[in-house]
Every structure is written in structure tokens, then in C-alpha cells.
Regions:
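A short helix->loop->beta-strand "cap" motif at the edges of active sites that frequently abuts
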Residues: 20, 73-76, 99, 199-203, ...
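Cap/insert and terminal regions of metallo-dependent hydrolase folds
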Residues: 85, 158-250
Length: 260
């Protein structure tokens, strides 16, 4: 069966593999603090239907409690080790909604139906708030079933990235973010293309761009909001020409036939 990836916007996507639905970093709101959703309709209620949800790190645009509250009771949450201690609201929400929580460190593996989900390191600030002390390691995940799908979460390039991830068929890489000034711990289109060349998957899906933008910034610097997806496609063609890049619109899907 083909593996299907649907991008809902930002870092939120559904990976369907081996009859299991894995939802990444769900964010289902029109506004979050100073950010406003500028492109793409809000995901439909069906986007919250999942067998397991993976959360890459504690930042509120990735671990978003009101969006997690839309999950059906019994939906399994996979979060970085220490997340419940760092975010007490997560512990309360999981108890009230009946969401089983599994905390993982880099290298940990869990089974989800016919899938194996392995946590891998990410080079990103793991704190909940920029100046806080509550923290947990930022992670990526490799979802292995008919294919091996790498969801990078939010990360910069780091030594040993390809070794930590291992062989993968699809790489879901962040290429933009929500602001124009992305430094350490992030991938811009150029660095994402470098990561793609190192990872050498069969296919790639750019994520984490062109959805949320600081209020007012879409009028001041619109090119920085729209450009990352197309820029990544161009740079990937130069650095990783053997990789099929799928630049999805919000709510669009790609399919990858299982490797023979």
C-alpha cells in the first residue's frame, strides 16, 4: 500500500502508513499569541483523527494544548521526556481527555500498530518559553512501516544528522518557520537542502512555512512568508537532484509507493 502524507500547515501533517494514522505537532487555530494564520483554511475536524500523535518539542506552536484537546479519547501522545513535568497543563489535559502519554528520549522506539516510531535528536531549543527553565529535549521522529518517514520537527543542521536518522524514504523538513530571522536551531531553505543531500531520501515534503506569520509582517515582508517553499524546491534540485520534492498546498497530499 502507498504511504500518504497530508500537510495541514505549519508542522502539522498526517502520515498514513500500514493502516495507522500518525499526526505531527497538531496546531488547529487561526491565531496563536502574535501569530495569525495567513494562508490555508483551518484543517477540518477530520484532521484531528489519529491513532498516535507525535510532538517534537515544547514550543507552543508545536505542543499546543487547545489543539490536543480536540483529539478523541484514547489517542496516544508521544512527547519528549520531561514534557509532563515541564508543561503541567499537558498532564491535566491528558487525564481529563483520556489521552495516554508516552515520553521518549532520542533512540527510544515505540510500537504503534504495525508501525515502529523512533525518536531521534534535533538541534533546537527545548524550553517551553524563551527565558524559562522548563525544558525537554527537542526531537524528530522516524515512522517506519511500509516506508520510513522522517519528521524533523524543528531543527538545525547538526553533525551526525544522517547517521542519527538512518535510511529514510521521505523527509519532512522545516524550511521556513514564522519569522524572518531564523538563526541557530532552524533550517532555512538552503540549510534544509543541505540536510536533504545528507539524508538522501526518495522524496521530501517541505513543512513549517507559509502558514503563520506575525501580525502585520505579511504586509511588510511578504516575500519572506511565501518564498521558502519555492526556494527549497530550487535549492534541493541543485543539491539533491535525485530526490522528488513535493511542495504541497495546505490540505494537499502526496503518496509514495512502498519500496520493493
Amino acid at each position: 500500500l502507498p504511504v500518504e502524507i497530508t500537510w495541514w500547515g505549519h508542522a502539522t501533517a498526517t502520515v498514513r502508513d500500514s493502516g495507522v494514522r500518525v499526526l505531527t505537532d497538531p496546531l488547529f487555530v487561526a491565531r496563536l499569541m502574535h501569530l495569525r494564520r495567513r494562508r490555508g483554511a483551518l484543517p477540518p475536524p477530520s484532521a484531528a483523527i489519529a491513532d498516535v500523535v507525535v510532538v517534537s518539542h515544547l514550543h507552543s506552536d508545536h505542543l499546543h494544548l487547545p489543539s490536543l484537546a480536540r483529539l478523541a479519547p484514547g489517542t496516544r501522545l508521544v512527547v519528549p521526556h520531561g514534557a509532563r513535568a515541564a508543561v503541567p497543563g499537558l498532564r491535566r489535559l491528558a487525564a481529563v481527555r483520556g489521552l495516554p502519554v508516552t515520553e521518549v528520549r532520542p533512540g527510544d522506539e515505540i510500537a504503534a500498530g504495525a508501525l515502529t516510531i523512533r525518536a531521534v535528536p534535533a538541534a533546537h531549543d527545548g524550553r517551553r518559553w524563551p527565558y524559562g527553565t522548563r525544558t525537554a529535549p527537542a526531537l524528530g521522529y522516524v515512522i517506519q512501516g511500509e516506508a520510513r518517514t522522517y519528521f524533523a520537527g524543528d531543527t538545525g543542521l547538526f553533525d551526525g544528522m544522517a547517521r542519527a536518522v538512518g535510511a529514510c524514504d521521505v523527509a519532512m523538513l522545516p524550511v521556513g518557520g514564522w519569522g524572518p530571522f531564523l538563526g541557530h536551531g532552524h533550517l532555512d531553505p538552503g540549510r534544509a537542502a543541505e540536510a536533504l543531500a545528507e539524508l538522501a531520501p526518495r522524496a521530501a515534503v517541505p513543512v513549517h512555512y507559509g502558514t503563520y506569520w506575525p501580525i502585520g509582517m505579511d504586509a511588510v515582508r511578504p516575500h519572506e512568508f511565501h518564498a521558502p517553499g519555492d526556494d527549497f524546491v530550487r535549492r534541493a534540485a541543485a543539491l539533491a537532484p535525485g530526490v522528488a520534492v513535493h511542495r504541497l498546498g495546505h490540505g494537499e497530499s502526496m503518496r509514495l509507493e512502498a519500496a520493493r
